[in-house]
Amino acid sequence: MVAVSVSQLRLYGIAQGAINETVAYTKERVQFGKPIWKFQNTQFQLADMQAKVDAARLLVYRAAQAKQDGEPHSHLAAMAKLVASETASDVARRCVQLVGGNGYSREYPFERHMRDAKITEIYEGTSEVQRMVIAGWLGATK
């Protein structure tokens, strides 16, 4: 059985932290005479990331609510873990891309966000295991 856990909310924190740090960095980093925050591509990428992070957070909340209400929730917990961990990894990777070479430097938090996010696709059941749980709920046979 898959359970809703605090680590699923931690995933939200990793992704949100990466976004917050990236927004701050892009408002200070100047390229071509203006902060890179001013470029539409930067704004659109961060807006897309924020929307995905909030969607993942809502799925975690839905799974937690189902558990609290005594409803079947294994499939919801698996979906929450899958979406939240893969969203956190994608967001962290995209944030590193936005900040450029400094994204790999230990002087900035971006490389840590990427490492912290990637491991979440592995521990407490890999993304593939979560997909197996979801497929089982959909009626897949073993």
Q: Which sequence ranges carry the predicted segments?
A:
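Alpha-helical interface subdomain recognition
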Residues: M1-K142
